[in-house]
Design a protein with these regions (language model features):
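Cytoplasmic helix-loop-helix junction between adjacent transmembrane helices
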Residues: 100-139
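Residue-level signature of mid-helix packing/kink "hotspots" within the transmembrane helices
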Residues: 23, 51-59, 109, 142-143, ...
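Juxtamembrane intracellular "pre-TM" segments in multi-pass secondary transporters
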Residues: 1-5, 181-214
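Helix-breaking motifs and short loop linkers at transmembrane-helix boundaries and internal kinks
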Residues: 37, 69, 90-95, 294-295
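Helix-to-loop junctions at the C-terminal end of transmembrane segments
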Residues: 58-69, 259-273, 357
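Conserved MFS/SLC helix-loop-helix module at the cytosolic interface between two early adjacent transmembrane helices
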Residues: 55-92
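Short amphipathic helix-loop junctions that connect adjacent transmembrane helices
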Residues: 27-41, 229-244
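C-terminal transmembrane helical hairpin of 12-TM major facilitator-type secondary transporters
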Residues: 274-318
Length: 395
């Protein structure tokens, strides 16, 4: 791992700048959609469009990165990000705003190439620690991004956040172009078809990968459902406003940055990735299911820390295990399949939980989300202990 640290730092910076741009735009989406007369359904369409496009692109871009290398994919998606944010800034209609989110969603599929990059430069025993670096970039991006977006909108008007995000994407492109080397050696490149969904079926049929793929589908489904139900419930029950919701997301980001930025590496010295995965899944199930029984903001914030901690140990452990069970020339493909399933969960979760919340009760919504996490926890129990660094999917 010491030899990989300079390149880990570079890929960390790449993902961090990417996520800051993402974080800049997300908090202002409701207001942007309202400018064009679109409210609940329109806002949901903007969120869903991103996740739906990411569902298709993560597997495709991961597969393509196994063929042409990680660097070209990362650079190309940075160009797409800049274009998407520029369109977002100047979109004259809701339709073009939706197109901007579709572009951003496709570019967001580059996470599979970024994770494959980490897998290329780390050993199997160090892989989950390297994935934790990616997680820390996510956490810090969500901390800094919304604040930058709010300041930009206040000082420069409605187009400013998109312009700032586009500028960051250009900075990211230039820095990566000059300092990010290719990580995939020529002998590990795979020349296969680029249609990714047959490989999704292969991954689900693979004995060692199947439970991990279920975890990757269920966890984003439950977590995204939780993030939809929580603001609705907290505003009516605890009388939360924008400030309290802002604190909630900052808490999640701070805990993620702290855990995945250092604590996770310490934990992996004494606890296996499999055990961290199982523990994290149970912690998330409990912290989601308990919410409707809480009566005070302080207890909700406390359980938010539990939720964020559990997610922060579960996510890099799950990513590391997926990478460990994949062959060297299939890292992008398999990680792309996992990320595609995650995007599918993020796409379906808000819709399902919204229907449950409206048609039944807030209690039912949280119990459905928590129950889904329990199913994911049960799936995690089926993850075998890694015996060897690489297991081919034979795809």
């Amino acid at each position: 791992m010491p030899a990989a640290r300079p390149r880990l730092a570079i890929i960390w910076l790449t993902v961090f700048i990417d996520l800051v741009g993402f974080g800049i735009v997300i908090p202002i989406l409701p207001f942007y959609s309202a400018r064009f007369g679109a409210h609940g359904m329109g806002y949901g369409a903007l969120i869903g469009a991103f996740s739906l496009m990411q569902f298709f692109s993560t597997a495709l871009l991961g597969r393509l990165s196994d063929r042409v290398g990680r660097r070209p994919i990362l650079l190309a998606t940075m160009v797409l990000n800049a274009a998407g944010y520029l369109l977002f800034a100047f979109a004259p209609s809701f339709l073009l705003l939706l197109v901007a989110r579709l572009i951003a969603g496709f570019a967001g599929g580059n996470i599979s190439a970024a994770q494959a990059y980490v897998a290329d430069i780390t050993s199997a025993s160090e892989r989950s620690k390297g994935m934790g670096v990616i997680g820390m970039a996510f956490g810090l991006g969500f901390i800094f991004g919304p604040g930058i977006g709010s300041i930009a909108a206040r000082l420069g008007g409605h187009a400013a956040p998109g312009l700032v995000a586009a500028g960051l994407s250009v900075v990211n492109l230039l820095s990566a172009f000059f300092i990010l080397p290719e990580s995939l050696r020529a002998e590990h490149r795979a020349v296969r078809d680029l249609w990714p969904f047959g490989h999704m079926a292969d991954a689900l049929a693979h004995r060692e990968l199947r439970p991990l793929m279920l975890v990757w589908l269920i966890t984003p489904f439950a977590f995204s459902a939780y993030t939809v139900a929580l603001p609705l419930w907290a505003t009516t029950t605890l009388h939360w406003h924008e400030q309290e919701l802002g604190i909630f997301f900052v808490v999640v980001g701070l805990v993620a940055a702290f855990v995945q930025g250092g604590l996770f590496r310490l934990l992996t010295r004494v606890v296996s990735d499999r055990r961290l995965l199982i523990t994290g899944m149970m912690g998330m199930a409990l912290s989601i299911g308990v919410v409707p029984f809480l009566a005070h903001s302080a207890t909700l914030y406390a359980w938010t820390v539990v939720l964020a901690f559990s997610n922060s140990i579960m996510s890099p452990a799950a990513t590391g295990l997926v990478s460990t069970f994949a062959a060297a020339n299939e890292q992008g493909t398999v990680l792309g399949v996992a990320q595609s399933l995650g995007a599918l969960g993020r796409f379906t979760g808000p819709f399902v939980i919204g229907v449950v919340y409206d048609w039944t009760s807030p209690l039912a919504a949280f119990l459905v989300a928590g129950g889904a996490m329990l199913v994911g926890w049960a799936a995690s129990l089926g993850v075998p202990k890694p015996r060897r660094p690489d297991v081919s999917l034979s795809v």
